[in-house]
Amino acid sequence: MKIKEVRITGFRSYKDNTNVSGFSPRSNVVVGRNGSGKSNFFHAIQFVLSDEYAHLKEEQRLGLLHESTGPKVAHARVEITFDNSEKRLMAFENSEVKIVRQVGKKKDQYYIDNKMVPRAEVVNLMESAGFSRSNPYYIVKQGKINELATSPDAYKLKLLREVAGTRVYDERKEESLKILKETKMKTEKIQGLLKYIDERLQTLENEKEDLKEYQKLDKTKRSVEYTMYDNTNKEAIKEKTKLDEQKVELNQKDNNVKSQLNDVIAEMAKLKTDKKKLESLGRGLREDKETLQAEETKMVEEKMTLKLEIDSLNEENTRERQGRQNAEHSLQGVGDEIFKNEEELDTIKPEYAKLLEEESRLKTDIRIDESRAKEILAKQGQRSQFSSVDDRDKFLRNEIRRISGLIADNKEREETIQKELADVEREDEKLNNEIQSISRTIDENRYEMDTFAAKSTSLKQEYDAAYVAQQTAAREEKAIRDKIGNTEQDISAANDQLRRIVARPVYNGITGVRKVIEEFKHDNRNGQHDDVINGYYGTVIELAEVPDMFRTAVEVIAQNRLFYHVVETDRIATKILRKFNEMQLPGEINFFPMNRVSAPRQRDLSNNSNARPMSDVIDYEVQYDKVFKSITANVIIVRTLDQAARDLRNEGFDVVSVDGDQMSKKGVMTGGFIDKKRSKLELHTQKDRFTKELAELQKSLAEAEKMVRERTQEAEKIRNRMQQHENQIGDFHRKHRELTEAKNAISQQFYMVTSTKEPKKDQLLGIKNHLRELLAQKENFEQEIGSNMSSQLTSDEEQTVKKLRKKVDEMTKQLATVSRRRMDLMHRKNAIENLLTKKLYKTKESLTARVDDISDNERRHKLENANAQLTSLLTRMESTRKQLATAISELQDYETKEKALQINIDNVLEQQRDLEKQQADFQLQYDKITAKEDEVKQKREDSLKKLILSRYSIKTRKNQFSYEISDSEEVGAKREPIEHRKLKISTFCLEYRAKLEKVHSNMRLLGALPTDTFSKWQNVKPRELEKKLLECVNELKKYENVNKKALDQYMTASSQKEELTKRMAEQKKSEDSIEELLKVLENRKYEAIDLTFKQVKKNFEQVFKQLVPHGRGKMQMRAREQRDDEEGINSVELYEGISVLVSFVSDDGDSETREMTQLSGGQKSLVALAIIFSIQKCDPAPFYLFDEIDAALDAQHRKSVADMIQSLSDQAQFVTTTFRPELLATAEKFYGVRFRNKVSHIDSVTREQAYDFVEDDTTHG
């Protein structure tokens, strides 16, 4: 038997389900850092198997539960799977056996193969597999090695005793001593009882003679008592007959009054119901009135608010209209002024451009001519400047190249500016087109906005009409709901009354069957319960309709059968009953299975106009004919139980009157007053009527709700359309503002683009003139190349200079004229442009925005909406006022009806008081009769008291007879209601019957009487009988202490003596057996201790030799000297302890034998391990758990321990924890424990990973 798998959940540091599987059947090692949870893994196994965790208190169980962040763990569970292939667990045939222990705050449970078992069964199972409770060393925890290594010799002896199993012997010895003590106590008691019985037998022998004389007197006394009881019986019968006659007479009178009173009370109940309904109607009318008044008040407030808003909007529109007209007038003037200035500007601009061009041309020509003159004059100094013609030409070519570069640059600039001007023209045209497009869009948007505004007003009117229709439908729905509430109250009241008059089990049964049918309907998948659902028809009372006048008679005959359940077959009844019991429902249910019901044959009724078969007065469907005829078979209904009814009874019919009086064909007549207010059929009829009314009202409510939904949806649709229109209008407004803003922005951009054209044209003109200068200069340089150099100008050159200077002077004069004219035009042009751009254009934009502002449209739209709302509000106010007038009128009608109803109630109350006065008169008569009854009762009880006193004077018979004497009620006591008085008379008659029965009982208690009792004492007067009874009593006083059971007691005592004698012998035999068992147990204990010591001693020498090959060890038993007073005791009792002597061969060859106290810590641990291995070999277990047993050993000894475990693993499984690498070398399976986030995790690892664990722990240790 080996550990195959361990599952840990919620135990200490293990939170989630931790599965440790794949254990080797030989050697397994668990490694991990200190505090990671290795020991908790061992504790989990101990938790299941060890006695250390056997009995845990609540706080100890809670201490085992995992504690960390996150949800709290509810329980700790450890499951160990054992390999049972060797069948060491013989009680199980499976190859695997699972043992589970689970603890929580309240529970501690064990399971074997998922079956809950007590702990004792788990313990017995482990013992059967080879685990001894006397040898706890198959689990060695941390510290156990050190504890054993440092323990004294006496502790080792105690350990040896446990291993030998002496605790079992001691427990059995203790149990045997306890049984022996109890046996001796029982023997002493039996001896005392025997002594008492002997004395009692002697006393009973003397009491026999007194008993005979006593029995003679007792017979005479009982004969006299019987005669007195017989006389009392006859008097009671006479009194009962008289009282019965009085009771019948009073009942007849009272029943008539009560019947009238019931009619009055029923009328009062009807009136109260009508009043209740009327009050409910009144509450509804008042609520409607208050609601309509509140609506009217609210509408008046809305009307005032709307009028104020309309007035305010009218004033704003007037102001805005005047402002707009002023803006339009101003816009016209500004437009004319702009037109005039633009016209003038258009006239100035061409002339200004022409002058500007002329001015620029003249300036350029002047510069060209001046430059030409300077160049000609410069030829005079060429000889001083240049050394040769080539130098000059070289200079000129360089200048030509420079000028050519400038020409190219200026041409490029010219092209760029021309391109920019073309772009500006295009942008100008584009912006102008956009302005025109936006203007058209603004006009279209304004048109759409006006159109939607008109539609919005129309939708508002539609919404008002829909709203009024919705409110009307809602009021109709509320009225129907009020009616439903009243009807449900009526049904609830009928159910409450029916619950009070129907027996609780029957009513619970009806409710339970309804739940069962609903359950069948709920679970009716694929029609599997259709037979039950369709085969259950309801209760009898639900299937019948009975006219009012016959309901009492039918109810008297049917009784609880009215609530029997009618089903198609008995199989369906069985299914319903089975489901009823499965659901554990309370109550009583009875069935009429139609396939089992058989109706008796209905005999023909002779001609009798006043009699009808009961089956003829009940209305039901034909399919239920057998059910109703089985209830009403051969039952005839008549008006009264007259002679005709007696004739029908003689013909074999059961007869019942319409008032409920019955006459059975067997001769039994029953009847009396029946409270029709408690009629089950009447209540059920009312409930059925109310239920039908409720169904109709609910149908009407569904239609009303549908109408409300439709009206609400219609109003909601219109409101949504209104909202959409409002949103659309808002979008139009927003779009208008956006378009206006866009138009203004583009206009600004247009003005900015336009303003850039003139500078660019001026710049272009300057570039062109500069090009002319450069071209002229280049041409001059080109002409000069190759010419001769001279110090003087030629005549042509001089003439050219003169012409050029003259031309320059003329052009200068012309330039002055042109410049002056251009400056004048420029000033005028700038003034006009400034006026237009800085004032007139902005004023026009402002006025245009004012004219085009849609706020007027918005206000107009608001005004139209407000006017439409006011119109709608006035319409709704008119409708509300009409409804309010109607409600006030209806409320006045209600108040009139309420007054009339109150008058009727007062009249009925007066009738009720008159009838109650008649009942009070009857009550006086009942009081007189009751007083007379009390007198008769008192006389009779006085005579009984005398008789009882005479009988109780004999103490020996005080337990043989008993009388129940009631205290007389005071005559003229507090007057009770008439119903209580009637009940009291009936009770009085019942008491007389009870008294008669008591007399008969007492006469029977007298036992067998002498044969002459009737003839001897029958004619004796009562006084003489009392005198004779008193004489007998006085004579019996002499024997008041006589033992009437002396003979029986003598026989019983003799039998008891014989039985006690036998038991005495058995107890003696038991004492001898127990003493013999104690001796055997003591001897076996001593033998077990000796045998165990020898085995452990031998094993220790072998194990120590294996662990320390060059050393030796032995164990010795130490015993104290025997004292003189201990002669005869076993030598084992003299043992004081076990000493251990070992020798280790040191490096210097020292092999001295030493005791445990002389060894080092590591040597002590090794010796302790040798002792444990020796004990385990003496009492081997299937597996062992070692927790860090090598902690204190050096490397050599750890290697020896590892080899020892490897050799022992052939016969047993080992699971060890360690911090050292030696145990890893010989192990077959390795497990690593990690601790993350306060939770331990254990996984299977390789040998190399296990070495890493050990090295990591050594590094961090």
Swiss-Prot record:
Coiled coil: 188-332, 406-450, 677-826, 857-930, 1023-1085
UniProt subcellular location: Nucleus; Chromosome
Single GO molecular function: ATP binding
Motif DA-box per record, residues: 1159-1193
A family per Pfam: SMC_hinge
Occurrences of domain SMC hinge (ranges): 534-645
Matches recorded under CDD domains: ABC_SMC3_euk (cd03272)
Effect of gene knockout: RNAi-mediated knock-down is embryonic lethal and results in aberrant chromosome segregation during mitosis. RNAi-mediated knockdown at 20 degrees Celsius results in the mis-localization of lab-1 in germ line nuclei.
Sorted UniProt keywords: Cell cycle, Cell division, Chromosome, Coiled coil, DNA damage, DNA repair, Mitosis, Nucleus
Any single biological process term in GO: cell division
Cellular component terms (Gene Ontology): chromatin; cohesin complex; MIS12/MIND type complex; mitotic cohesin complex; nucleus
Matching PANTHER family: STRUCTURAL MAINTENANCE OF CHROMOSOMES PROTEIN 3 (PTHR43977)
Function in brief: Involved in chromosome cohesion during cell cycle and in DNA repair. Involved in the repair of double strand breaks during mitosis and meiosis. Required for chromosome segregation during mitosis. Central component of cohesin complex. The cohesin complex is required for the cohesion of sister chromatids after DNA replication. The cohesin complex apparently forms a large proteinaceous ring within which sister chromatids can be trapped. At anaphase, the complex is cleaved and dissociates from chromatin, allowing sister chromatids to segregate.
Record's subunit section: Component of the cohesin complex, composed of the smc-1 and smc-3 heterodimer attached via their SMC hinge domain, scc-1 which links them, and scc-3. Interacts with scc-1, smc-1 and tim-1.
UniProt family annotation: Belongs to the SMC family. SMC3 subfamily.
Record protein name field: Structural maintenance of chromosomes protein 3
Organism: Caenorhabditis elegans
